[in-house]
Amino acid sequence: MWLQHLSLKTFRNYKETKIDFNPKLNVFLGRNAQGKTNMLEAIYFLALTRSHRTQTDKNLIHFDEEQLHLSGLVQKKTGSIPLEIELTQKGRVTKVNHLKQARLSDYVGHMNVVLFAPEDLQLIKGAPSIRRKFIDMELGQIKPIYLSDLTNYNHILKQRNTYLKSAQKIDETFLSVLDDQLVDYGCRVMNHRLDFIKKLESFGRKKHFELSNQIEELSISYQPSVNITDKQNLSESFKIALEKSRSRDLFKKNTGVGPHRDDISFYINGMDASFGSQGQHRSLVLSIKLAEIELMESITTESPILLLDDVMSELDNTRQLKLLETISQSIQTFITTTSLDHLQNLPENLSIFTIQDGKAAVNGN
């Protein structure tokens, strides 16, 4: 798949911009703070209805406006698909083929993206919430039912936590009803995540072995807060975990176990990767991103769109060449950079856009 056209209206520092893209390689060139990353963020937001840079949607709206509008035309094997997002102070409206979508799971997945940015190193060193968000964003694109199950789980979780905080006297029967619903959707979420991690590890192990000159083996471990060794008895394990945590939950007035407490760990040759070098972290994250591309292709039969936010200068020659091999294949890629000096090996079929003060101008093909 590839993004043929993008229209931005009052998004970040863009007042109104319309731009047609190259089906292969697109380079956003410009000084810092001109809007290069904002352009990538717009593409990411159009795909996922979420920003990778802020949790607050209103930060995306131009400072002197009250709403924003994004639209794009995606080309796929099955034909072209118009996508639209309108964001106001009241919320967002999403459209596919000009039809309003009632649920997030009905929208996400029509345009798949893989983002590689400097902050992705936090995937190894950062908090568990960063890794959970990574799973949610990637898995949600290839398995819409996951987003539906996750949304339902979070809804029940919010209900349970609100009840724990507000009730003067806890009705154990009502709490058990909430627990049963939490277990139902929670088990679905954990099973989705377990299957995803296994597939990601399979693709990632191969990529990392190649990238490390056949000396490092990558493994990924899913670490739920519930014992998941026996998938057949996962529901029972979750119920027992909630029962054991109930006194703690009543005291702290929140839910101590469940998918919202999950984590994943990365290992290189059996050693915790978080203790590795900066170079190992870069290689590991690159391996994961390349694995994501193959995983998405294997499930959707479409290549995702690759977004590279100022990462080429961070990679050594070996890692750059490995990434460029992927770019040279049939995958649309967007790169942000302040200079073309370190991009000599780029494919010939590319478009260069100069970004300045929230405006994009084509200056090379």
Curated annotation (Swiss-Prot):
ATP binds at G30, R31, N32, A33, Q34, G35, K36, T37. The keyword Phosphoprotein does not apply. It is found in: Cytoplasm. It comes from the Bacteria. Keywords: ATP-binding, Cytoplasm, DNA damage, DNA repair, DNA replication, DNA-binding, Nucleotide-binding, SOS response. Its main location: cytoplasm. The RecF protein is involved in DNA metabolism; it is required for DNA replication and normal SOS inducibility. RecF binds preferentially to single-stranded, linear DNA. It also seems to bind ATP. Belongs to the RecF family. This is DNA replication and repair protein RecF.
